[in-house]
A protein has these predicted regions:
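Conserved glycine-rich cofactor-binding loop
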Residues: 11-12
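Conserved glycine-rich Rossmann-like NAD(P)H-binding loop of the short-chain dehydrogenase/reductase
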Residues: 20, 25-40
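A hydrophobic alpha-helix adjacent to the NAD(P)-binding/active-site core of NAD(P)-dependent oxidoreductases
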Residues: 44, 87, 95-96
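The beta1-alpha1 cofactor-binding region of Rossmann-like NAD(H)/NADP(H)-dependent oxidoreductases
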Residues: 47-57, 89
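A glycine-rich helix->loop->beta "capping" turn
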Residues: 61-74, 80
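Hydrophobic positions on the long internal alpha-helix
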Residues: 73, 106-110
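Substrate-binding pocket helix/loop in short-chain dehydrogenase/reductase
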Residues: 83-84, 91-93
């Protein structure tokens, strides 16, 4: 049985390379991102990690297709550079919403299924 993996933020950078590497290893990789279209590295499902309903629907779609989820790679995120005194507070809140709460939303949607399965790491 091939492992079923979700990679968030899988259409660019580290997420894209992670999806490609896992696909090469024989995994069925689903990537969640805000983009309308995905890449050749994984099965694309449009889902913004800042939207709990989109995340829940995306997880349900993977489960409907595969019946299980083996691994979740929480990769969605972005950085802000520069001195803190020049950092826009709203942009910092958005970063925290994507980078931290996005991971929380994905894990809350996936972990109950993994617990029922009796296995499945979240990275």
């Amino acid at each position: 049985m091939n492992k079923v993996v979700i990679v968030t933020g899988g259409t660019s950078g580290i997420g894209l390379n992670t999806a490609r590497a896992l696909t090469k290893q024989g995994c069925r990789v689903y990537e969640f991102s805000r983009r309308e279209e995905g890449t050749d590295a994984a099965i694309h499902i449009r889902a913004d990690v800042t939207d709990e309903l989109q995340v829940q629907r995306a997880v349900e779609e993977v489960l409907a297709r595969e019946g299980h989820i083996d691994v979740v790679v929480n990769n969605a995120g972005f950085g802000i550079s520069g001195a803190i005194e020049y950092t826009d507070t709203e942009e910092a809140k958005r970063q925290f919403d994507v980078n931290f709460f996005g991971m929380v939303r994905v894990n809350r949607a996936v972990l109950p299924h993994m617990h029922r399965q009796g296995y499945g790491p979240s990275i």
